[in-house]
A protein has these predicted regions:
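Membrane-proximal intracellular helices of multi-pass ion channels
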Residues: 1-450
Length: 450
């Protein structure tokens, strides 16, 4: 038997975690009624948890017992940080040596270009995650404990904090997500903060933390500190800020007079709700306004934001902010008749452009295929089916109401789409392809008419 490549181990790791979770969720103990959940629904729930999507066929609060909810949030944490990162954390706890093979797996799972400093980075990720989720849980508890009591209030706070940070979008306090809290600033800004921090990526975290220490300890000017950020951080923060602002403005304009969403809200509340919708579409899945009631214009903006998603090495899905930046600046370089792509006075390697194009094309193929199949087997409207499939592929979790009514075929389609969205269609293609030897022959170039 041939040794598995790192990418194959990662693909298999997610599959094993999903199937193990589905078996636990299919047990009678996992439901409040004590009756076993149909396996397809248990598999759907395990997949949406591990893939940190948030599309649900059974209401998390009322259907699942505390045991079932604990299984779900454990799967969310594993899926958000990655199977390999969690496994490495267990090695730390057991004081086991991290081998070269383990380091290669970590590098592949996080999409890093080097193995230098991997082990300290994983330690910082695990510690940072615990601190951020802990702070989030405390803030949620200030709202949940007065409403639900200490026991369930604390449990709901922990559950929602992990879910928000991992960009899963699942909660156990309402059957309408966070719509009851549309005017609550603590709930809104706590959730948005966790979503953004989870979606920025762990590499960006490192730069931000080091920059913060330089400002506080060494009194380094903010401008100089920003100049010292790595190339990746500058791109991620710039694109993330632009997309949040872009989405907020458009959704505010398109929903301002919509009686089913924001018309009854005050001006500050409309801005808050628009900001939340812009942030949550970046693969989180919580909602403070009903997605089915959005105008078509807002739905299109939301789908665009969903497709882009978060940033590399983070908990979010989508094609990623860096991919968008490379493609946008590629178009600008063509318009300016420049031979290379330049961002922040740095040239982007040609192989990254090829990879960015491949990511976009493969994701579009998967998306069109899943929409077509869903239209054939579930007969939903075109907009609802598109919204569902974009949400599944980008691991967002927002729906216009299609998920609970999916047929078995529809559930299989969405399960497959969520898995592909989490591991990445390119990773799947690489995992099933043969590893080719490096070609020693370079063929001559030939021009084409475009």
């Amino acid at each position: 038997m041939k040794e598995l490549r790192p990418v194959q181990v990662i693909l298999l790791g997610f599959l094993i975690t999903i199937f193990a979770g589905s078996i636990l969720l299919a047990l009678p103990i996992a439901t409040q009624s004590g009756q076993a959940t149909p396996y397809i629904d248990a598999l759907f729930t395990a997949t949406t948890s591990v893939c940190v999507t948030g599309l649900i066929v059974e209401t998390t609060m009322t259907h699942w017992s505390i045991f079932g909810q604990a299984v779900i949030i454990l799967l969310v944490q594993i899926g958000g940080l990655g199977v390999i990162t969690i496994t490495t954390g267990m090695f730390f706890m057991l004081r086991k040596r991290i081998t070269l093979g383990n380091r290669m797996l970590i590098q592949e799972s996080m999409g890093l270009n080097t193995m230098t400093g991997l082990v300290p980075l994983v330690k910082k990720i695990l510690i940072g995650t615990g601190i951020i989720e802990g702070i989030g849980a405390v803030l949620y508890a200030t709202q949940y404990v007065p409403e639900f009591g200490i026991g369930y209030g604390v449990w709901a706070a922990i559950f929602n904090s992990i879910s928000a940070f991992c960009n899963a979008g699942m909660d156990i306090v309402r059957d309408d997500s966070l719509r009851s809290y549309v005017t609550n600033p603590v709930m809104n800004f706590t959730t948005m903060g966790l979503i953004i921090l989870g979606g920025l990526g762990f590499v960006v975290w490192k730069d931000l933390w080091q920059g913060f220490k330089k400002i506080v300890k060494d009194k380094v000017p903010v401008k100089r500190m920003i100049q010292q950020w790595r190339f990746q951080t500058k791109i991620v923060l710039s694109i993330t800020s632009f997309l949040i602002l872009f989405g907020t403005i458009l959704i505010f304009l398109f929903e301002y007079h919509n009686p089913a969403t924001m018309e009854s809200l005050s001006l500050p509340q409309k801005i808050q709700a628009s900001l939340f919708q812009s942030v949550t579409t970046r693969t989180a899945g919580f909602e403070t306004v009903a997605q089915a009631a959005l105008t078509d214009a807002s739905s299109l903006v939301s789908m665009f934001l969903m497709i882009i998603g978060g940033s590399p090495t983070g908990t979010a899905g989508g094609v990623k902010t860096v991919t968008l930046a490379i493609l946008v600046f590629c178009v600008l370089s063509v318009a300016k008749q420049e031979e290379s792509i330049t961002l922040f006075k740095r040239r982007v390697p040609q192989n990254l452009l090829s990879k960015a194009l491949a990511i976009i094309v493969i994701n579009l193929i998967v998306l069109m295929t899943s929409v077509l199949l869903l239209l054939v087997f579930d007969h939903g409207t075109f907009m609802d089916s598109c919204y569902e499939c974009v949400s599944a592929l980008a691991t967002v979790g927002l729906t216009k109401g299609l998920t609970p009514n999916l047929t078995i075929a529809g559930k299989v389609i969405i399960i497959t789409t969520m898995y592909l969205g989490r591991v990445g269609p390119i990773s799947m293609a690489i995992g099933f392809s043969q590893k080719n030897k490096k070609k020693m022959v370079m063929y001559p170039e030939q021009d084409l008419i475009l």
